[in-house]
Amino acid sequence: MLNKFNLNKLFFIAITLSIFNLQAQDSSDESIDSMEEVITTARRTEESVSDVPIAISAFSGTDLDEKGITNMEDIRSLVPNMLIQKSAGNQSVAYVSVRGMGSQRGSVQYDNKIAIYVDDAFMIRPQGSLFDLFDVNNLQVLKGPQGTLFGKNTTSGAILVNNNLPVVGEFDSSVKVSVGLRGLASVSGMVNLPLTSNAALRVVGITKKQDGYIDNLDGFSDDGGIIDNESFRAMLSVDITEDLNLLYSQSMFDSSGTAVYANCEVYTNSPMLAGGPALGVVTQGMKTRAVNDCNETGHYQSYHDATFGDSYLDLDKTLLKLTYDLGSNSTLTFTHSTAKHDDQETGWATGANRTEF
């Protein structure tokens, strides 16, 4: 009787575990099926990110919206081992590092170590690399050397930004309004217009303004860190034949404002401008303070005579792309792009508090 009871008990336990495993498997399968597949072009072809043997961080446009990513600088919060810093002279210029390697100079005469591609067009200089993001299809960060497929300036990696393309035969529009700290006000809009049965136009506009976060003690010039950006993008897509597509894009990015700290220092009394004979002695004494005062949560004060003008950037870009479908999952693409920029970069350097020395 005892053996029969034990066998019945074991049989009941086995049936219960089997049902539990089946339910867990079904739940897991549903979870996997519901996951959004992220497509990457890291190898110059569309593939699932899970099939690419490259260290890559890829995000869809929906991912960026849900995470509140509105500017290229924001992606540093999503990508491990990646650092993006603003240039002290112009807030649209970025210093980008991946895995500890990257660019530390934002001047026009220096090449990047990390390439930035926007709609397959290479940005040859860092000016304008901290642009605002809206109506983006996907963003990818490739880590490690990528010279085989993306040419030079990819010693540390590459950043690929692909915007949404015009959709033929469909009208669509969207508007996004954002407000935040320091008087932040941003408005972004998109309109997709079907022109004919084989052509469409997609227009995107962005404006973003924000007050500065550095109180200027000279009393005459603007505070530091002011943001005033305007972006515009128009893309025309024409299906010339069933196999041949023409894409033309015209974009502009205007960024004006005031510089941010090159070296941080809080002034409590009359400032002494850096650069004099005692600069070496002065900077030794204030190194620790400068590091502490660069904490973004602090309240900055400084002295900066900006009578020579604020920072600005006017960047105009054009893109022409012809894509021919060869069949058998193969395409032939011709891409031609131009970029013209006019900018002025002014920065604030470390000063000294006379009472401290």
Segments the model singles out, each with a brief description of its role:
Residues M1-S31:
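Cleavable N-terminal targeting peptides that direct proteins into the secretory/outer-membrane pathway or into
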Residues S31-V168:
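Acidic, small-polar-rich N-terminal luminal/periplasmic segments of exported/outer-membrane proteins
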Residues A42-E46, L181-R182, L236, M252:
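Short polar catalytic/cofactor-binding loops
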Residues V49-S50, V168, D211-I214, D343-T346:
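Short acidic/His/Gly/Ser-rich catalytic and metal-binding motifs that mark active-site loops
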Residues P80-I84, S188, H304-D305, T318:
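Short structured motifs
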Residues V93, K113-A115, T207, W348-E356:
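A short glycine/small-residue-enriched secondary-structure motif
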Residues D111-K113, R125, F134-K143, T148-D218, ...:
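Outer-membrane beta-barrel translocator/receptor signature
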Residues S221, I227-F357:
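Outer-membrane beta-barrel domain signature, strongest for Gram-negative TonB-dependent receptors
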